[in-house]
């Protein structure tokens, strides 16, 4: 038999090949597990914000960067409009357009929509690779491979990176971990080269997502802790000063960011730590030149003077408005009740709600239990890099509890620390395995004081293997059932187990596009603005950007008012059509009736809506009901009438009266009414979307037609 010598590799080469194979499999798994939605439905954009991102990306790919940067969108926020180039983070769009043009350069003809659909899964594969390298810097390659495999399927990250989820977070998590990796390399080496690469990665992060504020506060916090623990060195000084100076200059090139890095409160911590670095370096220089007594006197004097000057200058700048205060979302992170009490538009967003305990297990499963193990290992073997990952883990744990959206920021560090924890447990017990045959064991070995060492080690390894397998099954199930359903196309199981598709949203937008005038203005709640603009190509009053609370409040006032009062508002805003989402027939719970109280709160939050009181829409016992016991104010408002018009004659379930709402589980209280100021224009197949046309003004005393 011929010996195949070329297959005989050295141990080092086998090790490298195995690592490459495992990492490649993790990257492929990361991409493929996010394709459930495409396989089950089709290549379609999900949710709401991604439709705006897709629309702007398409404009960039077709018109070029110059027109994109100077684009004024007259289809949004009528009659105000919106400047697109200066009000978005363009990293996502530029990345997609660049990939699109590169593929076309090589004559790979792919539609820009498909580039957008598959971008997040592609970057999740890149995230897997970066996670491996980052974890390797913290422990070793084994921990890195485990962390990479974990982040490939962790539901907390998949929720924002499935195929079709074309949002900023799809590439931002990759940018964030890349910045962290470069930062740790810069801290370890003290090299300007790595620090400059960290600044470039940070620039990419700034261009992609507003969450960059977390980075520019976490890195300075890391430096501050290193100072307080006596670990500050020349390496840290070079790394941070380079990252801060270069990163700040680069970040200011993003139009939406502008001068915020030197003017806003969110960035002042980074600037303050930069100043502390200079003071620390100067103090070290003086210490080397003066005797201890002279240094002590000078040090106290300088610190007192500098501290007083900084506090005075900072207070003056904030009082005069030179340094802008924290934004509402930032206040909400520090005080979870702030948005609920002061800014209802922020509190109304579901992803801004506090996280429930069950969400942690649902999105992280095994990682919840292995995270403390990895944290313990890092505390037991402290280094500059491990202090950073500890701080990342602790801070992201807090922020994820305040806002469910930030589970996305927590998921990567959970994978990293869990990978370290699992790796440490397996390494510890692997050493206790005895793979020699029992009959060849020496008597000395058999009489050991730890006779069942091998059995305990085998048991622990099997337990860890079982938990890792259940984690994989759980993650795959959550991905398939919870995070792979595009909100634009809904599905349900029929009585015979078959899948029923509800395509009402696209049906309604298609009708709007082809059956309404080009200059028609559509009023809907802000959730659906991006979809209407992108798919129906019609002008809308408010959308998901939510930059003008007064304008949104005006729409809320119209929805919460009687027909007569609402008609005045609609004529004032030049509304042609009104669109509402209604789930009473199909059982769709995310409809406008369930969102209605937020319309009331936001509508009543401005001066023009002071007459709208939330308590008026409750029963005397404090209940929100749509049946006969419901508040008369609710039963006669515009939103109620648009949703339930003609619904009183519809049978929704067997043995139930007509007009039975399957979401609220109640027979509606106001059935027999007609619309005075609106006329029904279109209702989709399953009544999910209802469109009404606003009647013209009275003509010399005649009724509206």
From Swiss-Prot:
GO terms for biological process: co-translational protein modification; protein N-linked glycosylation via asparagine. Dolichyl diphosphooligosaccharide binds at residues 405, 530. A motif (WWDYG motif) lies at residues 525-529. The record marks 49, 351, 595 as: Interacts with target acceptor peptide in protein substrate. It is a multi-pass membrane protein. Despite low primary sequence conservation between eukaryotic catalytic subunits and bacterial and archaeal single subunit OSTs (ssOST), structural comparison revealed several common motifs at spatially equivalent positions, like the DXD motif 1 on the external loop 1 and the DXD motif 2 on the external loop 2 involved in binding of the metal ion cofactor and the carboxamide group of the acceptor asparagine, the conserved Glu residue of the TIXE/SVSE motif on the external loop 5 involved in catalysis, as well as the WWDYG and the DK/MI motifs in the globular domain that define the binding pocket for the +2 Ser/Thr of the acceptor sequon. This is Dolichyl-diphosphooligosaccharide--protein glycosyltransferase subunit STT3A. The lineage of its organism: Eukaryota, Metazoa, Chordata, Craniata, Vertebrata.
């Amino acid at each position: 038999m011929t010996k195949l010598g070329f297959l005989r590799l050295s141990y080092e080469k086998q090790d490298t090949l195995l690592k490459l194979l495992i990492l490649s499999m993790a990257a492929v798994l990361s991409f493929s597990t996010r394709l459930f939605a495409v396989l089950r439905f089709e290549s379609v954009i999900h949710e709401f914000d991604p439709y705006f991102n897709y629309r702007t990306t398409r404009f960039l790919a077709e018109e070029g960067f110059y027109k994109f940067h100077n684009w004024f969108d007259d289809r949004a926020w009528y009659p105000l409009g919106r400047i697109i180039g200066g009000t978005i983070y363009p990293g996502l769009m530029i990345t997609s357009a660049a990939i699109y043009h590169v593929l076309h350069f090589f004559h790979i003809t792919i539609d820009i929509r498909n580039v957008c659909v598959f971008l997040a899964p592609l970057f999740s594969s890149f995230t897997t690779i970066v996670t491996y390298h980052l974890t390797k810097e913290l422990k070793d390659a084994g921990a890195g491979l485990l962390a990479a495999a974990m982040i490939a399927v962790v539901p907390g990250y998949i929720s924002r990176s499935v195929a079709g989820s074309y949002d900023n977070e799809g590439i931002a998590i990759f940018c964030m971990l890349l910045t962290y990796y470069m930062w740790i390399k810069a801290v370890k080496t003290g090299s300007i080269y790595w620090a400059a690469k960290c600044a470039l990665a940070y620039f990419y992060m700034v261009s992609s997502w507003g969450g960059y504020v977390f980075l520019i506060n976490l890195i300075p916090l890391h430096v501050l802790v290193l100072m307080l623990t006596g670990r500050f060195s020349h390496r840290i000084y070079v790394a941070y000063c380079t990252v801060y100076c270069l990163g700040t200059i680069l970040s200011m090139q993003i139009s939406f960011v502008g001068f915020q890095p030197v003017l806003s409160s969110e960035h002042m911590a980074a600037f303050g730590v930069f100043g502390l670095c200079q003071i620390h370096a100067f103090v070290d220089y003086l210490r080397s030149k003066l005797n201890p007594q002279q240094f002590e006197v000078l040090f106290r004097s300088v610190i007192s003077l500098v501290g007083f000057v900084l506090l005075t200058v900072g207070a003056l700048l904030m009082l005069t408005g030179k340094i802008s205060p924290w934004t509402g979302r930032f206040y909400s992170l520090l005080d979870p009740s702030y948005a609920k009490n002061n800014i209802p538009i922020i509190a109304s967003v579901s992803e801004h709600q506090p996280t429930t305990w069950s969400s942690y297990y649902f999105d992280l499963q095994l990682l919840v239990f292995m995270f403390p193990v990895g944290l313990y290992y890092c505390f037991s073997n402290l280094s500059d890099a491990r202090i950073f990952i500890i701080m990342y883990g602790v801070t992201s744990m807090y922020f994820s509890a305040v806002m469910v959206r930030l589970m996305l920021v927590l998921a990567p560090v959970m994978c990293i620390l869990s990978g370290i924890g699992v790796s440490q447990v397996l390494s510890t017990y692997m050493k206790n395995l005895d793979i020699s045959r029992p009959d060849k064991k020496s008597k000395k070995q058999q009489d050991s004081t730890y006779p069942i060492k091998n059995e305990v080690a085998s048991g622990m390894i099997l337990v860890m293997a079982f938990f890792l397998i259940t984690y994989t099954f759980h993650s795959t199930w959550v991905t398939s059932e919870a995070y792979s359903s595009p909100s634009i196309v809904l599905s349900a199981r029929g009585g015979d187990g078959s899948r029923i598709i509800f395509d009402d949203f696209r049906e309604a937008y298609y009708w709007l596009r082809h059956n309404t005038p080009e200059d028609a203005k559509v009023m809907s709640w802000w959730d659906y603005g991006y979809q209407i603009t992108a798919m129906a190509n019609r002008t809308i009053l408010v959308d998901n950007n939510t930059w003008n609370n007064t304008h949104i409040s005006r729409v809320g006032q119209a929805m919460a008012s009687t027909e007569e009062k609402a008609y005045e508002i609609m004529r004032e805003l030049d509304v042609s059509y009104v669109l509402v989402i209604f789930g009473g027939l199909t059982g769709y719970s995310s409809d406008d009736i369930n969102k209605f109280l937020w319309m009331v709160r936001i509508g009543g939050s401005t001066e023009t809506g002071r007459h709208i009181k939330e308590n008026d829409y409750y029963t005397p016992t404090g209940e929100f009901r749509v049946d006969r016991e419901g508040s008369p104010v609710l039963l006669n408002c515009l939103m109620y009438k648009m949703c339930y018009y003609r619904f009183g004659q519809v049978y929704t379930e067997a043995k139930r009266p007509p007009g039975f709402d399957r979401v609220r589980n109640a027979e509606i209280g106001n059935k027999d009414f007609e619309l005075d100021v609106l006329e029904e224009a279109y209702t989709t197949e399953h009544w999910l979307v209802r469109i009404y046309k606003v009647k013209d003004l009275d003509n010399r005393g005649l009724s509206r037609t």
